[in-house]
């Protein structure tokens, strides 16, 4: 009886235990980032203040578009990058442009956000050709940011956590898929309008 109880407890604990994630496999080099679509939640904390929103994100080279939405689905703004640079469209339709997404974010919110690297980090890779370090706990350090990533058993990102000491950004991915081949664009939709 004593052995049956012990075996039952061990089975229960084993069933409830989460297998540790292999930190070495979180950041793997690959030739290129695959196209994807994603949806999820976004949290940003700066100077003790936090903001929350939903996002939908399409990465289909050469165009990358991130929409920031309210919990009810209204679009607060859109950020798009293509070969011609970066642009943002706010909820009122005002368009802002810069040579890079990092420069555009500095102009609009006062912080250089590593937006042009997010798709690479979400794909589980450090930016090629740039110095980086992977800490023992699986955290990537690159461009002055620490980047934590969790993935499902198939390697798809589930969370991406970025911190540069002043700013903390957390993306939680609820859906990830492939974009429709019929939706291929060569430039941001806001440039066409």
Swiss-Prot record:
InterPro entries attached to this UniProt entry? LolA/LolB/LppX, OM_lipoprot_LolB
CDD domains xrefs: LolB
Where it mainly occurs, coarsely classed, is membrane
**Biological-process GO terms, alphabetical:** lipoprotein localization to outer membrane; protein transport
Alphabetical GO CC annotations of the entry are:
cell outer membrane
Q: Keywords in alphabetical order, please.
A: Cell outer membrane, Chaperone, Lipoprotein, Membrane, Palmitate, Protein transport, Signal, Transport
Where in or outside the cell it occurs: the entry states: Cell outer membrane
One Pfam annotation, family name? LolB
Lipid-linked residues (N-palmitoyl cysteine) = 16
How does it sit in the bilayer? Answer: Lipid-anchor
The source's domain of life comes to Bacteria
List the signal peptide residues: 1-15
Q: List lipidated residues, S-diacylglycerol cysteine.
A: 16
Function (record text): Plays a critical role in the incorporation of lipoproteins in the outer membrane after they are released by the LolA protein.
Q: Can you state the subunit structure given in the record?
A: Monomer.
Belongs to which family?
A: Belongs to the LolB family.
| Protein name in UniProt | Outer-membrane lipoprotein LolB
Look up and give the organism this protein is from: Neisseria meningitidis serogroup A / serotype 4A (strain DSM 15465 / Z2491)
């Amino acid at each position: 009886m004593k052995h049956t109880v012990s075996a039952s407890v061990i089975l229960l604990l084993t069933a409830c235990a989460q297998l540790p994630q292999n930190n070495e496999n979180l950041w793997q080099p690959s030739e290129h980032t695959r196209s994807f679509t994603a949806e999820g939640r976004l949290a940003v904390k700066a100077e003790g203040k936090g903001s929350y929103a939903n996002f939908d994100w399409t990465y289909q080279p050469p165009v990358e578009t991130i929409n920031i939405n309210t919990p009810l689905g209204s679009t607060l703004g859109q950020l798009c990058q293509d070969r011609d640079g970066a642009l943002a469209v706010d909820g009122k339709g005002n368009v802002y442009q810069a040579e890079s997404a990092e420069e555009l974010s500095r102009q609009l919110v006062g912080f250089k956000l590593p937006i042009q690297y997010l798709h690479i980090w979400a794909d589980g890779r450090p930016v090629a050709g740039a110095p980086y370090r992977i800490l023992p706990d699986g955290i990537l350090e690159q461009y002055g940011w620490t980047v934590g990533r969790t993935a499902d058993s198939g390697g798809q990102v589930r969370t991406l956590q970025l911190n540069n000491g002043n700013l903390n950004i957390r993306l939680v991915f609820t859906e990830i898929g492939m974009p429709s081949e019929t939706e291929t664009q060569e430039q941001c939709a806001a440039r066409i309008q």
